[in-house]
Amino acid sequence: MTSVLKHAIAFAFAAGFSVFCVSSAAARNVVIPFSIAEGMASPDVHDKIDGTVQFYFGDTKHPAVLQKFGIYVTNQKTSAFLVSDAKSCRRAFASALIEFQKRALELGANAVINIHSYYDKEDISSNTDVQCHAGGAMTGVALRGEFVKVGGP
């Protein structure tokens, strides 16, 4: 067997193995219950959310609604490459809340209530967790919430 043929076979094997590894990783889609409390306490959220907008997940009690601005959805993704599921979920969760805060301030809202997980338009309500979808390349958190102005404590 010639040296060129050996190199060609080795290259073909390596290329095929790489495609197999990448396609296997990309096909991964694990649903992870991600703790809202953990997410809210993380530096990713703590450093970016300024407190002007309050977030109420599931059916958590909130002050009286004075004005409604509508229901909005955000679907935030972040790289999962060489990052733990927990870290990529934290980042995606933080990105979703940052988007909600930005939208609320644009609308004049001071709260987002009834926040639910909304991945693939599947509405799942929880006071304690959101769904994080971790894949081989990307991790995503999709949230749906009602933007309102609330009064009082």
Q: Locations of the language-model features?
A:
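Bacterial N-terminal signal peptides
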Residues: A8-F20
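Surface-exposed short loop/turn segments
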Residues: S79, R91, N114-P153
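Sec/Tat signal peptide C-region and signal peptidase I cleavage site
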Residues: F20-A27
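Compositionally biased P/S/T/G-rich terminal and signal peptide-adjacent segments
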Residues: G39-F81
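Extracellular/periplasmic catalytic domains that process cell-envelope and extracellular macromolecules
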Residues: P63-L66, L105-E106, G135-M138
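N-terminal secretory signal peptides that target proteins for export/translocation
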Residues: M1-L5
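Short, well-ordered alpha-helical segments
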Residues: I71-I124
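Glycan-processing catalytic domains of CAZymes
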Residues: R28-P33, S42, P153
